[in-house]
């Protein structure tokens, strides 16, 4: 039998991260535990729906004599500025409308026009946020909730520096 090497995984996707994860949160925790880990951060895309599974399974492990710490977090969809993103989107949308109005005067490359708007809509980066303490967990809950509001959401829940700075206490980014 090989010697286990202690580790803590700080970025794992469960099956709750559609098209990017596999298994239930409990499966990830069990795998980590059986391979030398005593903690694991579940960081699903844009939400924390696996948190209840983490809490319940950690209690089950503790009752069985295993000391395993779930680390609560999220892989956020992050942009430097949501205001700039909205402006770019509106500008691209208006340019597309202008081209559509002027279609009788010129021939539009429809695919290129759609691609320009689509690229702006899909623009995002990934940022791992981990809760350092209860305050951090509460702040991540607020960040995730804010990212799903209409102004921040188009296919993906987004957050930016302004939002992150409002709710940064106890959050490791």
Where are these regions (language model features)?
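Phosphodiester-processing cores and adjacent nucleic acid-binding clamps
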Residues: 1-173
């Amino acid at each position: 039998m090989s010697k286990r090497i202690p580790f803590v995984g700080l970025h794992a996707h469960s099956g709750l991260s559609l098209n990017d994860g596999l298994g239930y949160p409990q499966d990830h925790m069990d795998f980590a535990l059986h391979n030398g880990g005593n903690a694991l951060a579940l960081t699903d895309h844009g939400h924390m729906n696996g948190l209840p599974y983490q809490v319940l399974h950690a209690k089950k492990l503790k009752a069985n004599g295993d000391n395993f710490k779930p680390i609560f977090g999220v892989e956020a969809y992050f942009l430097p500025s949501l205001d700039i993103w909205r402006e770019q989107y509106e500008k691209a949308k208006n340019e597309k409308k202008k081209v559509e109005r002027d279609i009788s005067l010129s021939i539009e490359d429809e695919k290129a026009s759609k691609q320009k708007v689509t690229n702006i809509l899909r623009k995002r980066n990934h940022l791992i946020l981990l809760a350092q303490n209860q305050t951090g967990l509460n702040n991540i809950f607020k960040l995730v909730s804010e990212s799903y509001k209409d102004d921040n959401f188009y296919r993906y829940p987004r957050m930016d520096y302004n939002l992150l700075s409002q709710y940064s206490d106890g959050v490791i980014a």
